[in-house]
Amino acid sequence: VRYADENVRTKEAKKK
């Protein structure tokens, strides 16, 4: 699930 991992990272980066 690389897509899910990337999505979580992107969501975290946007939250920061």
UniProtKB/Swiss-Prot annotation:
GO terms for cellular component: ribonucleoprotein complex; ribosome. It comes from the Bacteria. GO terms for molecular function: rRNA binding. Keywords: Ribonucleoprotein, Ribosomal protein, RNA-binding, rRNA-binding. Belongs to the universal ribosomal protein uL6 family. This protein binds to the 23S rRNA, and is important in its secondary structure. It is located near the subunit interface in the base of the L7/L12 stalk, and near the tRNA binding site of the peptidyltransferase center. Part of the 50S ribosomal subunit. This is Large ribosomal subunit protein uL6. The gene is rplF.
